[in-house]
């Protein structure tokens, strides 16, 4: 890893795919070929893997699992593991939904992704399972699109299993194209790359086993990703993560600026309380800042705001264009997980930016085709896994939320119950606003 890492633009990349399609092996091998993980580590994993009785199957996959375990245990590990660079960018790798909280984290912005890889398998039957209703590839593709991850690369893995056959690749591409198109991606913007996570073909080095493929390697294609514009020109929105009381300083809220900019002296309003005040100072990592903009994680001191007026889940904004607070809104959702079916009146917990609030699914307006938006059924009696629908939602207390069209960062949410994410969605329209 070189010293000029910080000078390159930084992108967060998320790796998704069905459980057995080899995403961890692919990324582990990729990191080894890049020199981010040394061969000694891989050899150690191979030895450990042999002990499981499955041969050295996991020698690459465990590179990613290492990160996951250690993350779950809360240890900060050698950053090189989950960071790598290309000639153009500096990437942080987020290994996707191995765990249940992943979807919630993505929606609430804890793990923000700029771009994604979807790993499919060229092995007979595996992609069919992955893209079927309830398959993880289908679920992940839907979520990526719903959550505003607009840049996608599809890696067609396990080419070594199909003896590097162009026909097997084409079959998988056809299925993969159907999937990414159905969730709303434009095919001309989604490259497909034949790879072998196990053998290393087309990860970093061009494969000699597929002379029929003339496109880029995985590494080369990463440099085609584009940097997203920071939403600094929009009105200020800062969802509050925590509020601390610091002796001698007073009330110090902490949060990430989602849109806009702020500086000491600015007038602000906190919603839903409607309390108004002024920014006294801003700091990040214990360093005072002259200003903050979209993307910055900050703590700040406010003049004129009492501790009782601000809490986690509130949103700070510009008094001239205050954060909206909804009593009811129209949403487009996709049902991800439920043992039976959802009926109107069901009340899961809504997670939106930093807010958590019980919310009633008060009315099912229509069931829709997610690819075209065409109505398939008016006023459905129930919704089941895989359904996309337009519904009305009433949070049990007024909640700061925005339409996805105006503020994508503030207009997406997860509905959770029994420790699982039941549905993910975006706000189409605020139908009843809470006025302070």
Curated annotation (Swiss-Prot):
Question: What cellular component terms from Gene Ontology apply here?
Answer: cytoplasm
Q: Provide the residue positions that the database annotates as binding GTP.
A: 17-24, 95-99, 157-160
Which residue stretches belong to region G2?
A: 74-78
**Which UniProt keywords are listed?**
Cytoplasm, Elongation factor, GTP-binding, Hydrolase, Magnesium, Metal-binding, Nucleotide-binding, Protein biosynthesis
Residue ranges, annotated region (G4): 157-160
How would you classify this enzyme at the top EC level? hydrolase
Origin superkingdom: Archaea
- Could you confirm whether the keyword Cell inner membrane appears in this record? no
> Where do the record's region annotations for G3 lie?
95-98
Q: Is Magnesium among this UniProt entry's keywords? A: yes
Molecular function GO labels: GTP binding; GTPase activity; translation elongation factor activity
Extract the ranges annotated as region (G1). 17-24
The record's section on InterPro entries has:
EFTu-like_2, G_TR_CS, GTP-eEF1A_C, P-loop_NTPase, T_Tr_GTP-bd_dom, TRAFAC_GTPase_members, Transl_B-barrel_sf, Transl_elong_EF1A/Init_IF2_C
| NCBIfam families in alphabetical order | EF-1_alpha, PRK12317.1
What this protein is reported to do is described as: GTP hydrolase that promotes the GTP-dependent binding of aminoacyl-tRNA to the A-site of ribosomes during protein biosynthesis.
Protein family: Belongs to the TRAFAC class translation factor GTPase superfamily. Classic translation factor GTPase family. EF-Tu/EF-1A subfamily.
Q: What is this protein called?
A: Elongation factor 1-alpha
The organism named in the record is: Cenarchaeum symbiosum (strain A)
């Amino acid at each position: 890893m070189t010293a000029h890492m910080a000078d390159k633009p930084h992108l967060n990349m998320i790796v998704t795919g069905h459980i057995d399609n080899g995403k961890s092996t692919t990324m582990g091998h990729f990191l080894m070929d890049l020199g981010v993980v040394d061969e000694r580590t891989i050899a150690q994993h191979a030895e450990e893997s042999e002990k499981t009785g499955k041969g050295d199957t996991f020698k690459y996959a465990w590179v990613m699992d290492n990160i996951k375990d250690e993350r779950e245990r809360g240890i900060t590990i050698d950053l090189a593991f989950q960071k790598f660079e290309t000639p153009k960018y500096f990437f942080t790798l987020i290994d996707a939904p191995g765990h249940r909280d992943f979807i919630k984290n993505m929606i609430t912005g804890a793990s923000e992704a700029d771009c994604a890889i979807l790993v499919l398998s060229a092995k007979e039957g595996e992609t069919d399972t992955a893209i079927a209703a309830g398959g993880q590839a289908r679920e992940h593709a839907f979520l990526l699109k719903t959550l505003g991850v607009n840049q996608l690369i599809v890696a067609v893995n396990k080419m070594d299993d199909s003896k590097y056959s162009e026909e097997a690749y084409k079959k998988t591409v056809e299925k993969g194209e159907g999937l990414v198109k159905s969730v709303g991606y434009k095919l001309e913007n989604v490259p497909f790359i034949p790879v072998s996570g196990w053998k290393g073909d087309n990860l970093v080095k061009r494969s000699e086993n597929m002379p029929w493929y003339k496109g880029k390697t995985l590494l080369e294609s990463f440099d085609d990703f584009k940097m997203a514009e920071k939403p600094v020109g929009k009105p200020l929105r800062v969802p509050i993560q925590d509020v601390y009381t610091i002796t001698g300083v007073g009330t110090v809220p902490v949060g990430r600026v989602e849109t806009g900019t702020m500086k000491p002296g600015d007038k602000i309003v906190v919603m839903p309380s409607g309390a108004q005040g002024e920014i006294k100072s801003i700091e990040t990592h214990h360093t005072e800042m002259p200003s903050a903009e979209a993307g910055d994680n900050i703590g700040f001191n406010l003049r004129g705001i009492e501790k009782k007026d601000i809490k986690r889940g509130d949103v700070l904004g510009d008094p001239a264009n205050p954060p909206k607070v909804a009593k009811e809104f129209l949403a487009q959702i996709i049902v991800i997980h439920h043992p039976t079916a959802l009926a109107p009146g069901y009340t899961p917990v809504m997670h939106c930016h930093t807010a958590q609030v019980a919310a009633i699914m008060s009315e099912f307006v229509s069931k829709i085709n997610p690819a075209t938006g065409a109505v398939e059924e008016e006023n459905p009696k129930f919704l089941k896994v895989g359904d996309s629908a337009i519904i009305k939602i009433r949070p049990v207390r007024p909640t700061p939320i925005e339409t996805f069209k105006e503020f994508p960062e503030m207009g997406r949410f997860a509905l959770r119950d029994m420790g699982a994410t039941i549905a993910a969605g975006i706000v189409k329209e605020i139908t009843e606003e809470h006025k302070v």
